[in-house]
């Protein structure tokens, strides 16, 4: 989950690359570095820490060079040190590489190269690329052949960019199970893990498909090849981006801004996919044979898995179609049953999640009837690899802990459930109107909720706690799974989520005097059951914080503290209560003085398995 940025052109390449790397820090921020060819010698600078630390190394950034490659790292092989930071160079310092991914056969290749007398400077798998390329180039003196031969030896995920000191006007780059995008400017080319990193300079792009590499030369269009050295024609795509992602709009953190973006984002989805009366528009999934599916399999990771889990509950409550939810990293190794009339749904905010992409390939291999993607990036691998893709329309999300992208996923999945129910005749006209109107009220309810000061003030008295239990039932269970994950991600607190009814089957043994238990009581069908679960933990002297509808003032009798949520339709409740969990986690991280936007050990886009 590293970020790559390269530049070839006539401008100040070092400044442009540093700026691009700063926009890619969501992919990793353990260390950073860059390489350039200056007067036929490699110029290398790298450091442990953030891109700003790298920028501080340049008193005068204006360096006479046409080609620069840079990298911001999230460590997978080798601890974060300056030696392990990218770029890596060969023994003779003739070439340098930056790499995102994991080379699965690196130990085998390292043994072979070591046996040939090659010494390695780092502990990383990435150094294999540059040492192997250098060996081939010494023998052939052919850039393209040597690069192709190198790539053919690598198993795993590889996005990389490579420069050679004897070819100062050329950058070699490749994609293999890891994203890499070319940005096409006027007499300049950009190379990046994410097109938004060069959006300021050009909106014209070409995405390398897996198994393709490009020769980027100054003054020429990039030449793209496959590993059989067949030249590939690539269409130029127009990048669309609706906002300046670097603007926090006065908020202290991107995460907080993105939390408060949600009413507007949800309003946009509602206006796009619903009519004024609250009906799902006929154009929604109109080209998908939605009535033909007998079952649904959802595959996702992390927060997207929680969204899929909620979709299972909602869809099965609306229409008689079985829904299976799978963790992507387990799915491809488990060989679950896939019926011939199965709809596969792949959920990924970035559209580049490695395990979810692997599941996509496995589902294709299993001849699944249809694949639907749900993601935020139109040019992503998942968006391009499915039969139809629903886009989150959430805008750029920079905070590592997802907020607005997650609630957009929830709303689109609710729309999917309503569409399925409609085509199967499972809802009366009155139900359709009621459900639609309940969803249309969401943006206003979100605004009202976010004005509730108790969401922020709750955290300080609990900032010394090192563990929390979250309880929820039915639709609230996936919501508390997400809330607990948020507390782990940005406040570094051990937080576990359980269905309320499971407490007496083991987890209640964790309760001691003062243990904080957060109970989400936003599902009317199981409200009384949740009251019983809260009384169980209260009897063991837990400190209970109840998250409940504002009309349920009686909940004060069985809880120590209450946070009230506007009354809403049951389909809107998961979104509102999810936002409660987001703000509570943010408030706790703030109270503990944590780095909220860039939590330790995490990256925004998980592009390695």
Swiss-Prot record:
Active-site residues annotated for this sequence: 2, 604
Annotated Gene Ontology cellular component terms: cytosol
Pfam families reported in the protein's UniProt record: GATase_6, SIS
Location(s) in or outside the cell: Cytoplasm
Enzyme Commission identifier(s): 2.6.1.16
Main localization, broad class: cytoplasm
Keyword Oxidoreductase among UniProt keywords: no
All copies of domain Glutamine amidotransferase type-2, residue ranges: 2-219
Gene3D superfamilies noted in UniProt: Glucose-6-phosphate isomerase like protein, domain 1, Glutamine Phosphoribosylpyrophosphate, subunit 1, domain 1
Enzyme class: transferase
GO MF term (any one): carbohydrate derivative binding
SIS domain sequence ranges: 285-426, 458-599
Reaction equations catalysed: D-fructose 6-phosphate + L-glutamine = D-glucosamine 6-phosphate + L-glutamate
Keywords: Aminotransferase, Cytoplasm, Glutamine amidotransferase, Repeat, Transferase
Domain of life: Bacteria
GO biological process, one term: UDP-N-acetylglucosamine metabolic process
Database matches in PROSITE patterns: GATASE_TYPE_2, SIS
Its biological purpose: Catalyzes the first step in hexosamine metabolism, converting fructose-6P into glucosamine-6P using glutamine as a nitrogen source.
Database matches in PANTHER family: GLUCOSAMINE--FRUCTOSE-6-PHOSPHATE AMINOTRANSFERASE, ISOMERIZING, GLUTAMINE--FRUCTOSE-6-PHOSPHATE TRANSAMINASE (ISOMERIZING)
Oligomeric form and interacting partners: Homodimer.
Protein name in the entry: Glutamine--fructose-6-phosphate aminotransferase [isomerizing]
């Amino acid at each position: 989950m590293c970020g790559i940025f390269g530049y070839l052109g006539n401008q100040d390449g070092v400044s442009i690359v540093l700026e691009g790397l700063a926009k890619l820090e969501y992919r990793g921020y353990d260390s950073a570095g860059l390489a350039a060819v200056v007067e036929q010698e490699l110029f290398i600078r790298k450091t442990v820490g953030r891109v700003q630390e790298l920028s501080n190394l340049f008193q005068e950034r204006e360096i006479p060079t046409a080609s620069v490659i840079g990298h911001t790292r999230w460590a997978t092989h080798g601890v974060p040190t300056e030696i392990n930071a990218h770029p890596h160079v060969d023994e003779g310092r003739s070439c340098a590489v930056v790499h995102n991914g994991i080379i699965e056969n690196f130990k085998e290749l390292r043994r072979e190269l070591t046996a040939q007398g090659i010494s390695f400077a780092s502990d990383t798998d990435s150094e294999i690329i540059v040492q192997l390329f250098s060996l081939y180039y010494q023998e052939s003196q052919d850039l393209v052949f040597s690069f192709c031969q190198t790539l053919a030896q690598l198993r795993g995920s590889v996005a990389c960019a490579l420069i050679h000191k004897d070819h100062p006007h050329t950058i070699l780059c490749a994609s293999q199970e890891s994203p890499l995008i070319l940005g096409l400017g006027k007499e300049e080319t950009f190379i990046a893990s994410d097109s938004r990193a060069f959006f300021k300079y050009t909106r014209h792009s070409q995405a390398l498909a897996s198994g393709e590499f490009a020769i980027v030369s100054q003054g020429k269009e990039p030449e793209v090849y496959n590993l059989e050295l067949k030249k590939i024609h690539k269409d130029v795509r127009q990048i669309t981006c609706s906002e300046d992602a670097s603007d926090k709009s006065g908020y202290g953190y991107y995460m907080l801004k993105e939390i408060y973006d949600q009413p507007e984002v949800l309003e946009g989805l509602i206006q796009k996919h619903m009519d004024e009366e609250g009906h799902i528009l006929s154009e929604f999934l109109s080209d998908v044979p939605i009535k033909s599916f007998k079952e649904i399999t959802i595959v996702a990771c992390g927060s997207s898995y929680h969204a899929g889990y909620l979709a299972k509950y909602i869809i099965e409550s609306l229409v008689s179609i079985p829904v299976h939810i799978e963790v992507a990293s387990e799915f491809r190794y488990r060989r679950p049953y896939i019926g011939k009339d199965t709809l596969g749904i792949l959920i990924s905010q970035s559209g580049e999640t490695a395990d979810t992409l692997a599941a996509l390939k496995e589902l294709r291999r299993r001849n699944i009837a249809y694949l639907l993607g749900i993601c935020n990036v139109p040019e992503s691998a998942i968006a391009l690899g499915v039969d139809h893709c629903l886009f989150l329309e959430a805008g750029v999300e920079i905070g590592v802990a997802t907020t607005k992208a997650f609630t957009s996923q929830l709303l689109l999945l609710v729309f999917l459930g309503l569409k399925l129910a409609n085509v199967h005749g499972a809802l009366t006209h009155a139900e359709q109107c009621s459900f639609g109107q309940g969803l249309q009220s969401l943006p206003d309810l979100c605004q009202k909720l976010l004005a509730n000061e108790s969401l922020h003030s709750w955290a300080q008295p609990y900032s010394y706690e090192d563990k929390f239990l979250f309880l929820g039932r039915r639709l609230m269970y996936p919501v508390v799974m997400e809330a607990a994950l948020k507390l782990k991600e940005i406040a570094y607190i051990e937080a576990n989520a359980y269905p309320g009814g499971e407490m007496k089957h083991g987890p209640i043994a964790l309760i001691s005097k003062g243990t904080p238990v957060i109970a989400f009581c936003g599902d009317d069908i199981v409200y009384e059951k949740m009251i019983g679960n809260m009384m169980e933990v209260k009897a063991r002297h837990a400190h209970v914080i109840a998250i409940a509808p504002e009309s349920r003032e009686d909940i004060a009798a069985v809880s120590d503290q209450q946070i009230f949520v506007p009354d809403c339709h049951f389909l809107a409740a998961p979104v509102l209560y999810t936002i409660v969990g987001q703000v509570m986690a943010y408030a706790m991280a703030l109270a503990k003085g944590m780095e909220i936007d860039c939590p330790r050990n995490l990256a925004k886009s998980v592009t390695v398995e």
